[in-house]
A protein has these predicted regions:
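Conserved donor-binding/catalytic core segment of Leloir-type glycosyltransferases
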Residues: 198-216, 222-225
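Conserved small/polar residues in nucleotide/adenosyl-binding loops
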Residues: 312-321
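Nucleotide-activated donor-binding/catalytic signature segment of Leloir-type glycosyltransferases, i.e.
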Residues: 244-264
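Membrane-proximal helix-turn-helix segments that form the acceptor-binding/catalytic region
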Residues: 84, 136-156
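Short N-terminal targeting/anchoring amphipathic segment
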Residues: 72-75, 83-104, 115-117, 155, ...
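An aromatic- and histidine-rich active-site surface loop
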Residues: 45, 79-80, 95-113, 118-120, ...
Length: 323
């Protein structure tokens, strides 16, 4: 008898989509499981092209109006309706919330079951810059939702050994398991041949790739690069996020969503990759560098230290990044 697994992926950040899709597809190809999944798309951030049909996907669309987006974050009625229907029709042996899924915190609180599983991504919140009061309050609500989910759900998983130890100490009565971090490599990345126009004509460069947030230390990287006496390679910062005042013609800022089809070109042309994170529990960007066989300069945070083949530097002083 096959085990029936229902995966839920209600969040669609660029790194979250391949994380969830890889896990879903892996079990969908395993004869021991009957897999179903409920995934939420938002425009270009979509699961549609990477989830296998064997996973029996149900796709929902994130609302477009500001008012409906707010309602979605508080009580995502469409997700709850479809989730309830799937639970009744499938009668799954496990329901696994893969992507943080803070919008479902109240639903989980009211309907918690021993068959629920929850992937913990960041036990400790990242340092994030919010420019408005609404943004600040929403960030607090998101953090509260994550905490409520992991406090209530009886089965937790993580892809960080450092976090695994801490979770077991905090929740001694819960089942806490380690799962390997899924690769972010998708077929669109593997077969992609699209060249980002911003790097047209460049033969080699130093690359930072990923969403630009404060905790990722991109400002430290920029300062360190500007302090170099020899700038034989340009610095490319590729990924949507807060903008950085550089006033340096050798720094190329690609502040937009990077399509999967563009990733291969960016990595293949890079001399090496830099990840100067101040903090992070887990990060899938390493799988991209490994796949394209690129050297990585990374800060000494626990998740990076769990992985071999890295050159480490201090995550805080600018001198460390410069060296």
């Amino acid at each position: 008898m096959k085990k029936k697994i229902l995966f839920v992926a209600s969040e669609f950040a660029s790194g979250m989509i391949p994380f969830a899709a890889t896990a879903i597809n892996a079990l969908a190809k395993d004869d021991r499981f009957e897999v179903h999944c409920l995934c939420v798309n938002s425009g270009i951030y979509s699961y549609r092209n990477i989830i296998l049909q064997e996973a029996n996907p149900v796709f929902l669309e994130y609302p477009k109006s500001k008012m409906m987006k707010l309602f979605y974050k508080l009580w995502p009625l469409e997700i709850i309706k479809h989730l309830s229907q799937l639970e009744k029709s499938i009668n799954p042996d496990a329901v696994h919330f893969l992507t943080g899924d803070f919008t479902l915190a109240l639903y989980i609180c009211l309907n918690n079951k021993r068959t629920f599983y929850y992937t913990v991504h960041d036990l400790h919140p990242h340092e994030v810059v919010r420019k408005t009061l609404l943004g600040y309050l929403m960030q607090k609500y998101i953090i509260w939702g994550y905490k409520l989910c992991r406090n209530i759900i009886p089965n937790l998983t993580t892809s960080s050994y450092f976090q695994l130890k801490e979770l077991k100490e905090i929740y001694p009565c819960k089942k806490v398991k380690y799962t390997s971090f899924p690769s972010l490599i998708t077929s669109l990345i593997i077969n992609g041949k699209k060249m980002p126009l911003e790097v047209s004509g460049l033969k080699e460069y130093i690359l930072f790739f990923g969403t630009v947030d404060k905790y990722k230390g991109v400002d430290l990287l920029v300062d360190a690069y500007c302090n170099l006496t020899c700038k034989s390679l340009k610095l490319v910062i590729a990924g949507r996020g807060f903008d950085i005042e550089t006033h340096n013609e050798n720094i190329i800022r690609i502040n937009r969503f990077i399509e999967d089809e563009e990733v291969a070109y960016l990595f293949k042309k890079a001399k090496f990759i830099v990840y100067p994170y101040r903090s992070a529990t887990m990060s899938g960007v390493l799988s991209l560098a490994y796949y394209f066989n690129k050297k990585v300069l990374a800060s000494t945070i626990p998740f990076f230290e769990d992985n071999a083949c890295l050159l480490y530097t201090s995550p805080s002083p600018r001198d460390g990044a410069t060296s």
